[in-house]
């Protein structure tokens, strides 16, 4: 995403403290159960997919085919990973 933002002439967030400030996914601490870890990953992916879909709508309205295509590809990959993690959990 950062490269795409640069291509469009803007400056992406580029340090960890910026990411922490704008993130909607909070850090999980001291998770020792494997299944719980996978549940946390799944919940995080659902947040990411929702945000990517919002961006997909925005890029479509803006006529930005490059970013739209990139978001579509990212969503496809995340959905596949969600399916695999759900399969792992027996869902």
Residues of each region from the PLM?
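Short amphipathic alpha-helical interaction/hinge segments
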Residues: 9, 53, 82-86
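Acidic/histidine-rich alpha-helical segments that form the ligand environment
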Residues: 3-4, 17-73
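Short, contiguous alpha-helical
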Residues: 69-91
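Leucine-rich amphipathic alpha-helices with coiled-coil/heptad-repeat character
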Residues: 1, 5-12, 89
């Amino acid at each position: 995403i950062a490269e795409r933002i640069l291509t469009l002439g803007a400056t992406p967030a580029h340090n960890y403290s910026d990411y922490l400030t704008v993130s909607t996914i909070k850090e999980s601490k001291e998770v020792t159960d494997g299944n719980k870890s996978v549940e946390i990953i799944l919940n995080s992916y659902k947040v990411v997919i929702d945000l990517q879909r919002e961006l997909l709508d925005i890029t479509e309205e803006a006529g930005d085919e490059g970013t739209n295509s990139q978001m579509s590809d990212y969503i496809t990959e995340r959905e596949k990973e969600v399916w695999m993690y759900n399969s792992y959990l027996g869902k």
